[in-house]
Amino acid sequence: AKKRAGNGCFGLKLDRIGSMSGLGC
């Protein structure tokens, strides 16, 4: 979940957590 959904979604800020990064998309 590093650059999975945090590519262009709001998960960029939550990309560090990696958990909410997927929920971003």
UniProtKB/Swiss-Prot annotation:
GO terms for biological process: regulation of blood pressure; vasodilation. Keywords: Disulfide bond, Hypotensive agent, Secreted, Toxin, Vasoactive, Vasodilator. Its main location: secreted. GO terms for cellular component: extracellular region. Venom gland. The keyword Secreted applies. It comes from the Eukaryota. It is found in: Secreted. Disulfide bonds join 9-25. GO terms for molecular function: hormone activity; toxin activity. InterPro entries: Natr_peptide, Natr_peptide_CS, Natriuretic_peptide_brain. In the C-terminal section; belongs to the natriuretic peptide family. Snake venom natriuretic peptide that has a vasorelaxant activity in rat aortic strips and a diuretic potency in anesthetized rats. May act by activating natriuretic receptors (NPR1 and/or NPR2). This is C-type natriuretic peptide. It comes from Crotalus atrox.
